[in-house]
Amino acid sequence: MACHEIINSLGFSLENYDGIGRWRDTENNKRVDSFTQFETRAGDLVNLRGSRSLAQFIANDSNAQKNFVQNLFEYMIKQPIQAYGENTVDDLHAHFVKSNFSCKGLIVEILCLASTKGIKQEES
């Protein structure tokens, strides 16, 4: 458990899983404690206990949502999202939120954006 204090406190919220992903309530005859506090970029402390509270925190965090949007864009288009404009992440995130977090809608929006605002390729 000490490694999570050094690396990342979020790991404590996953302590109920062993090294190969099996669920456990005890380790070495001691109850597993999955409680942790995480400091956000804004400096707020968030209390987490277990994987469900971690998942809820991540799903509701706008930074995590924007990272998802950026990673999906770059995976699909194979280009850095910044090449499509400095507001592209924010614009796609706003669309994602407005669509009630529809991944299908986000994929369509990314494809439409990339096809209409693509990077010009050099002529060979």
Regions from the PLM with identified roles:
Residues 1-74, 86-103, 107-124:
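Active-site substrate-binding loop specific to GH73 endo-beta-N-acetylglucosaminidase modules
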Residues 76-80:
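Core structural elements
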